[in-house]
C-alpha cells in the first residue's frame, strides 16, 4: 500500500510544515502555496490529509482559514495539533531595517520585540513565514529582515539574527488535521472534541442552540463568528465543544438554517 499524502502551507520550514510532521510523520509531504490550494488538493483527493492553522494562543483565530471552511461539507476534522510558535529574525543585519516580511499572523505574535527594536520598519505581508525568509535572504541591501521559524533557517541555511522574539514564550498555534469526505456516522462514539458549523438567519436561534448545549452539559471551547455573505448581519458560527453526543446533532440542527457536523477528534488542550 502506498504511503498517504498530507498537504500543508509551504514552502518547507513553515509552522504548517512542522504541524504536518507532527500529525502524520509517516505521510508524504505536499507543500502548497496557499491555504486555498491546500483545501483544494484535499477536496479533489490529490492528498489524503491536510493541516490548517485555526488559532494562535497569542493572536487569536486565523480568520482566512475559517473563511475557507465556510459552507464546506466535503472535508472532515479528525485531529488537532499544537505547534510551539517560536519566531526568529532572519536576514543580513539589524542595523538599518526598513522592512519586515512575514505572514500576517506573525506580526501580531511579535509586536513587543518589533516595537522595541525596529519600531519604524514597514510590515510586508507574504503568504508564509518561509517565503518571507527566502525573500529576505536574497536582499543585499541589509534593509530587509523576515520573521520566520528556526526550522526554516536551519533547513535552508539562512542567516539567523535573533531567536525567540514572540511576545509569549508559551506561544502556540493550533492546527486542524483534515481529511477528505464529510462526516460518516459509523455508529462509534464521538471523540472528546467536536467541530460544528451552522448558519442562523436570526439571532434568537442562537439562544435555542445554546440551550441545548447547556441542558446536556456540552462545553463550548471555541466560538468563531463570520459574516454569512447571504444577508447583512447574519452569520456562520464555528463551534468547538466537549461532550457532544450523536443524538444531539439533530437536536441542534433543527434550529439552524444550515448545519454541518465537521468531525470529532481527541482534545489536546488542558482547559481545567
Curated annotation (Swiss-Prot):
Q: Which Gene3D superfamilies match?
A: 3.30.70.260, Periplasmic binding protein-like II (3.40.190.10)
Give the GO cellular component terms, alphabetically.
cytoplasm; cytosol; nucleus
ACT domain: from which residue to which, for each copy? 194-272
Q: Does the keyword Lyase apply?
A: yes
Tell me where it resides.
Cytoplasm; Nucleus
Looking at the record, the residues that make up the Prephenate dehydratase domain are: 5-180
Q: Which GO terms describe its molecular function?
A: prephenate dehydratase activity
User: What GO biological process term is on the record, naming one?
Assistant: L-phenylalanine biosynthetic process
Q: Where does this protein chiefly localize?
A: cytoplasm
Which keywords annotate this record? Answer: Amino-acid biosynthesis, Aromatic amino acid biosynthesis, Cytoplasm, Lyase, Nucleus, Phenylalanine biosynthesis
- Entry keyword annotation includes Amino-acid biosynthesis: yes
InterPro entries of this UniProt entry?
A: ACT-like_dom_sf (IPR045865), ACT_dom (IPR002912), Preph_deHydtase (IPR001086)
EC number(s) for this protein? 4.2.1.51
Catalytic reaction annotation: prephenate + H(+) = 3-phenylpyruvate + CO2 + H2O
Please name the pathway: Amino-acid biosynthesis; L-phenylalanine biosynthesis; phenylpyruvate from prephenate: step 1/1
Q: Which PROSITE patterns match?
A: ACT (PS51671), PREPHENATE_DEHYDR_3 (PS51171)
Function as written in the Swiss-Prot or TrEMBL entry: Putative prephenate dehydratase required for the synthesis of L-phenylalanine.
| Family the UniProt entry places it in | Belongs to the PHA2 family.
| This protein's name | Putative prephenate dehydratase
- What gene does the UniProt entry assign to this protein? pha2
